[in-house]
Amino acid sequence: MKKSYLYLMACAMGAMSLTSCSEDSTPAGGGGDSTIEVTLAQVSKPKPNPWLAQEEYSITHFNSAQTDAFSYEVKDGTFNIDLSKCQMTWSGPVNLMTLASTSPKYMWGMSSDRVSYLDISDGKLERVAEAGLPGITMKTQEQLTNMTADYATYDELSKTITDILGPAPQMSMANGNYVLCDKDNYAYTNAGQVMVRYRLANPNNPKEGIVLDHQIRLTDFTFNSFTLVGATMTYDGHLVVAAQNGILVLNRALTTIEDSYALPSDQILTNSICIDENGGLYVASNSRTPGGKGLMQKLICKDGKFSTSPADGAWQAYYDGGPKAPCIKLGYGTGSTPTLMGFGQDEDKLVVITDGSKRMKLVAFWRDEIPSGAQQVAGYDKRIAGVHEVTCGLPASTEWIQSEQSVVVGGYDAFVVNNINVTDQEINDKIIGVIAIGPIVKGPQGTECVRWNTKENKWESKWARSDVSSVSMIPAVSTKSEMVFVCGWNDASGWEVTGLDWKSGATRHRTILGKSNRANGAYAIIQYLANGDLLFNSVAGPIRVKY
């Protein structure tokens, strides 16, 4: 999504807002297809990774396939929430995800300034232990409160944030950006180019604290990268770490770099990676030049070694890039972490991203052997199974429709959001920008759900909502409730988590959180707990919202 991390740090963050819709809002319908309709609870799921703590929530984007799908039920209805009555903890300014641990009673809170161990049993959300990241100063509750206070102007907000975080607040995003918890309850995160794993001092008594178990500085091994951008765990128990200019594989103990792979010199990586149960590692990099082609690759990672040989199943395929986009979109290629689609006995096995075009396209690649009967899409690599220009129901005159979010996948359906809006406000820092979105700076609108037609091997639009927008949080879908959730700003009522029906796009759920910026999700992912409570990973720390 970005040209380089230095460029990312210098570029502006775009503004977005959500105009929430009433429950009887009707989406624009798409064409039908011949794919058999089944409930999301019935569709094939990614194979559980035996090296992760749980099947769901133990890695960013919820599973190794990065589908952003969870199995818990969420209520229909409209809920007005008083945040002052909610249980919350303090950390930030980015709390990307709260990870499932090996115990259903506890979760790991993963932040840009610390790691926490949270007791979620019996309806609680209580921090029982915490530890700072190497070289990072933990923010105080007072500082985080000031960051989320009400401000009349962008300049006023900017001054406060820089006073707290320094002259380049978005540098904090280089920490804790992709995280996971393994089967032995080690939590992995990063502080810049240092990869770290944590454990409990006493697994039988979490209140005794968190120990930094091991760390490894990767600066000399990342091919001159500025920062790390992703991490995953292979199905045979090796840690794969993505940097801007290459990929590394390490042992879980973080004592050995087992292998490395350098990206082509014209490519840069700023999104994370996903992996399948057979060692297929999917990497979507971007061109370093405007309009240049991005590169989707499948590497093979087995026994701690990379292979780029087609004989082992590896492949490469170029996809469309684009010009420099307005903020929030940065760089010239995809803003998506690759997402797998099709599992088990499903007919088609795909990996999907959005491309870098001004009006983005949803691109599906055959991730294994290309079917013998597959027709090549005109003008594209034969590895590309299908291409769909996303409209989000917006007028044909809309210049930019682009996304910084991963594609949400359930069955053969894919959900995307538009993150681009041209604004007169100059925004030169992503953290300042994301805190300004909604309350101070107006943002874009538009979501769309698209289906892969397995009979005709093509994308078809199911529905679109031009009146709904996701601000910066990663959307997520409940397979049991068949709702996809976004978070955005409503000028009348403030921050809101909105649930849209997966089949029709109609609004079914509204959690109205109010106008306090404590309810700003700042790049985090939307999560729900087993009992249906919202686990809201806000800019100042996780909040448990009960219904």
Sequence positions of predicted segments:
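Beta-strand-rich domains and repeat architectures in extracellular enzymes and scaffolds
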Residues: 39-118, 171-184
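Surface-exposed loop and turn segments in beta-propeller and other repeat-based domains
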Residues: 71-86, 129-168, 211-224, 264-265, ...
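Repeated scaffold domains used in trafficking and secretory/extracellular systems
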Residues: 90-100, 135-149, 164-181, 219-232, ...
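Asp-box/WD-like beta-propeller blade repeats and closely related beta-sheet repeat scaffolds
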Residues: 148-176, 181, 192-194, 199-235, ...
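Long, internal scaffold/assembly segments composed of regular secondary structure
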Residues: 274-399
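Loop/turn-rich, solvent-exposed surfaces of beta-rich toroidal or solenoidal domains
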Residues: 348-353, 402-516
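Blade-level signature of beta-propeller repeat domains, shared across WD40, Kelch, NHL, RCC1
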Residues: 520-547
